[in-house]
Amino acid sequence: MLRASASGAKCAVKLIVPLHRGFIVRSDIIPLRLRDSEYVESAVSFAEPLQTYSGKKVAISSRSDLTTYFAAAAAGLILRQGSTHASDAGSQALFQMVESDLANRLSFPWIQPGTPRRRTLALVDANSSHPQDGLGFYRAARELGINVVVLENAGHWLEDPAQAHWREAFIPTRLTNPPEEDVGDHILASLRAYGKPVDGIVTFADSFWYYIARIAHEIGVETAPPDSMRIATNKFLTSKYVGHDAYLASNVDEALRIAKEVALPYPLIVKPCDGWSSEGVSRVESPDAFPAAVKSIDTSRHGTEFVMEPYCDGPEVDVNLVLLDGEVLFAEICDDLPKSADVNGLTVGSLTNFHELYSVYPSALPSKELELLIHSFVDTLLRLGIRNGVMHLEGRVQNSSMEYREQNRMMHLQPRAPQATRPEPSAWLIEINPRPLGMTGSHIIESTYGIDYWGLAAVLGVGDKDRARALSQPYRDGPQYTCVMVFIPADFPPSSQGIFDTDDICADLLARRPDLAQHISRCATLVRRGQKVAHPTTGRHTFLAYFNVFSRAGREEALDLARQVREEVRYSFL
């Protein structure tokens, strides 16, 4: 089908008409699954949340009867036409390639049988500090037809009636982090004040899960056992549970005494029990390094208790799992390249911490080691009684057959030299997060595999098992490319004021390097000019920006493009 564009040039359009009877799994599913398609310039959904379709073929009176076409369509596509597609033969070839691409991306039950039912999900902690941040979950819930009841402190921007389109209700609820012991009572009181049943309750702030699990039965919903959530969200308890030689301390003197009494082998990792974003995580090489490591923990955010445990120098990974009744619906693993504080880390500015620098999707570890990680981590979750949800776990492969080596100013996974005495590889769990990985991190899964973790968290949260199974199915042919998330952490001299003095990091780079721009799926600048940013030595980690950089040619090109993006970033601080 052809239509005239605004410039007078012709372009090809394709409409997607459902031929199965039922309701759409989420209203934006077709644009979501077609992101970064080589053949689609833009995709627009015509569907409403939970919209039903008859599944009948379209009967038209003439080729010009566009109204009937559009009325039946769930979405429309404008195809990407190059010079080779200008002729009729070229257009036919384009349509054939599009059909093949659609078969890859839409070969799953995106039309669900039966009658849809709108469900309600309670969310503890809004997970969004301002209207321009962290809306992915709310957008997903809206497209899924799930009502969200937000429990958050009074005065949050979501309480504003002008923002009511993002939620069903806002219930002012006293929340502190770290939580107060009676926070469960506050949550229960708020849900009773809401006065209507909910189909589920979730949080994306890990420290609240234990308290939610304690009161869940009183509102008629199921979660993992409270003690299990306590272990999963406390890094000391997690380490002890999986058998690490871990110790708990609250100050430097206590840490030094323990290290001496039990003769802990250096290097050690010191990290807060209730931490996030790798804040306050240090590698300690000797007793003299303890004071600086403990000082780097922001106790106002993470509390005073910290873990001491052996440092594992194997390749680091993120393992993301979708669980339903103990079954793994989807699993993927990415490589976290060595950080500045790793023994083999790259030098990036003045950073000497565990701030993320690069994450590469999918992992290049051997399939045997990938299977080992998934089997080990799933076994840990199931032994804890955690059987449902989107899980983000971090770990390493101890005694891996691979190691990182620097090549062309970038770290590459390479086979290690064979050793007859090397132990077999084993999975080393760093932490469990009973939630999806961060919002920006989840975007890369969406574009690489076609799966939105935040939408899955919503449908699993309300117990919608059929939609969870459908939305857990990746592209039929696997990841569409290799993608690298390039993190741009705050880095500036400690003597400066820490005032960000740049406009838009991403817009600047895209304008200067259009050759790199065509390999960037998503990017965002996360701070604004004039904003005061904490220095990394304070224990706070701030991302200035991120870029999701992809290559269809393979991992080596993706890593080189990622290196170029980092080197081209420009910013300044006052």
Curated annotation (Swiss-Prot):
Give the binding site residues for ATP: 263-318
InterPro entries (alphabetical): ATP-dep_AA_Ligase (IPR052032), ATP-grasp (IPR011761), ATP_grasp_subdomain_1 (IPR013815), BL00235/CARNS1_N (IPR041472)
Residues annotated for Mg(2+) 1 binding in this entry: 394, 431
The record's section on SUPFAM superfamilies has: Glutathione synthetase ATP-binding domain-like (SSF56059)
The UniProt record gives the binding positions of Mn(2+) 1 as 394, 431
Encoding gene (name): fsqD
Specify the pathway: Secondary metabolite biosynthesis
Copy out the induction comment: Expression is positively regulated by the fumisoquins biosynthesis specific transcription factor fsqA.
Gene3D superfamilies linked to this entry: 3.40.50.20, ATP-grasp fold, A domain, ATP-grasp fold, B domain
Sites binding Mn(2+) 2 sit at: 431, 433
Q: What is its EC number?
A: 6.3.2.-
Coiled coil stretches, renumbered: none
This one is known as ATP-grasp enzyme fsqD
What is known about what this protein does? ATP-grasp enzyme; part of the gene cluster that mediates the biosynthesis of the isoquinoline alkaloids fumisoquin A, fumisoquin B and fumisoquin C; as well as small amounts of fumipyrrole as a shunt metabolite. The products of the cluster lead to a brown coloration and are important for growth and conidiation. The nonribosomal peptide synthetase-like protein fsqF, which lacks a canonical condensation domain, is required for addition of a serine-derived dehydroalanine moiety to activated tyrosine but is not essential for the subsequent steps leading to isoquinoline formation.
Q: What class of enzyme is it?
A: ligase
Keywords recorded for this protein, A-Z: ATP-binding, Ligase, Magnesium, Manganese, Metal-binding, Nucleotide-binding
